[in-house]
Amino acid sequence: RQLPQIEFGMSEYLSAFIQNNDASLITIQNALDHSSTPVKGIIESLISLREGGILYLNHHPNEAEMEKYKGFHQYNVDERNGELYIWNKDYCINVTKLLDGFASVETKRMDNGHIIAIIRKKTEQNELPIQLQTYVDDRKDKGELCQVLLQFQYNNTSLLKSIRNSISFRIFDTIQFFAQ
């Protein structure tokens, strides 16, 4: 028996990696709270699923609060009265209500404290419901990705960084020369 092909990708752009409603199971474990837009990651995952496909989430509760919003910890994943919430200081979304009609959401806080959500896509409709369309905007996505790439390029090719890298290389090269 052959195992299914396993794909990896950024949840916020998952439908670019997994196309044509082809996936039957997508798992996101302790990653949504580290992403730039976790609700978009959920919706992109649902776009990639076939009808009846499952998005399985397993997260530590409210990590951004615990980590004081440092580094990648910018969002909290929580369960309230059996419903899934994504929130931070400025933003709170009841994901269960947001996805109503497009997907069913079963959320539970486990004995170990983890938040487990099983989200099942109800339909294979090509058109996203209006309340979900605002999270998926290809033009905006391209702009954001270009901005990230340009910032990365700037941060890694600035004159100061080039000089620093050049000096570091020369020092390393000199040490190696004398070590031989």
Describe each region flagged by the PLM:
Residues 4, 54-84:
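Conserved class I S-adenosyl-L-methionine
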Residues 39-54:
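A short glycine-rich, Lys/Arg-flanked "PGG" loop and its adjoining helix->strand segment in the class I
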Residues 13-21:
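Short amphipathic alpha-helix with an adjacent loop that forms part of the alpha/beta core around
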Residues 1-14:
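Class I SAM-dependent methyltransferase SAM/SAH-binding core
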Residues 137-180:
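Boundary detector for helix-to-coil junctions that initiate low-complexity/charged tails
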Residues 33-35:
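A short His-aromatic
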